[in-house]
């Protein structure tokens, strides 16, 4: 039976959150700077006080019980609040001085991440980024679970409990095989996609959905190529080999055009494109910090790429 007078300690909740996020005691103990035996004792005391088992222990991996999964978001919120309280009490004036877990979608990472990392290292030397690359849906799931602090994704992201800050817009460019009649054109109508074999990324990539949306808005039904690609770089190589055409974001052009004999064409106005933004948990209490980070990211990317900052 639970002790109705029991009040969980921050140490106990922090231990639970660490074990839940790492899914193992060794990694959680290392992250907290304690021994595994100490961590186990603290977590056991929390479970005893609550009168419920939070995790299932095994020799290789830790699993959350249904009760643990239900209580984890509350524990994460308390730990985040405690950390914010400690930072405020210490008189911190720079909310971006510590570590941050940042997620990015695959069609952003190879093209703008080097610019972002170099700029942050120069402008915010105290901020250490831990980067995770994944598709949008999985990034949002991990973000909601508390294993990420923020993510750079294509908007909109209509997800409960998540706040989005638009950063920049960029055009899509039509990637064509070398020598294609449309290569070099600057006013290709989107309706031209009806007559071209469109090569798409695999299911789950937001760029796939965006390409199909371009066709839909143009009122055409795309002729899909027989080939699909797991990455934009692979898609570009397939296009170079004559297997179809594809859409690439403007930020990808310098990289992809430099390593392949790629034909490129601009769409006629209004040019289709995408909006990239920063998302974070609405409950984090760090809106100002993330808005500052979003502004810095936009400034860095716009200095090196042909994008339009969202005002």
Swiss-Prot record:
Residues 25-44 bind DNA. Keywords: Activator, DNA-binding, Transcription, Transcription regulation. InterPro entries: LysR_subst-bd (IPR005119), Tscrpt_reg_HTH_LysR (IPR000847), WH-like_DNA-bd_sf (IPR036388), WH_DNA-bd_sf (IPR036390). Residues 8-65 form the HTH lysR-type domain. It comes from the Bacteria. Belongs to the LysR transcriptional regulatory family. This is Probable hydrogen peroxide-inducible genes activator. It comes from Mycobacterium avium. The gene is oxyR.
